[in-house]
Amino acid sequence: MTVSVAMQARIDKIDAHLNEHNLRVEKLYGLYPILKSNSNDSTKSLACSGAKGSGFSWIAFFFPYAVCTQIREFSFFAFQASFYIIAAWIHVITGKDFSTGVAFGICIAYGYWFPYLRYLALKENRKEYAVFQSIIFGLFLSFASIIPSIVIESVFIHN
């Protein structure tokens, strides 16, 4: 697995934070990362900013479909599909289209979450896809994940 110097620095910060505060990274509902205490299983907020924070991954902000595919984090597509379906139903009911806001929100979330997801992938020794493969496969999966919302809007919105 190839990890950039910047990402390795983020992973090292995450590891130091986890060790210092007796925490572990888990995925809630298999979808997004959370921190849990090793002693009492309580949930803690992710450390994303500040001196001990993991920071923001701009590559994950601009290309979440590709980086998540590369590390085999396919829950991204379920997360994306869920929010687009909700946005489609809101569009059907209210006439207001929030799909652009949903896309922007997903990109921001994965910009912050990606260092933790990368940490989990490294910890679990997940085999990675090559960059070109992850871009092509990720685009295909991303399109497939928005098909349900397209169908909902096509069937229920009559212009």
What is each PLM-predicted segment?
Residues 2-48, 84-159:
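Transmembrane helix recognition focused on a "late"/terminal membrane span
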Residues 33-76:
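Membrane interfacial helix-start motif at the N-side
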Residues 59-65, 80-90:
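Hydrophobic, membrane-inserted alpha-helices
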Residues 77-78, 101:
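Hydrophobic alpha-helical transmembrane segments
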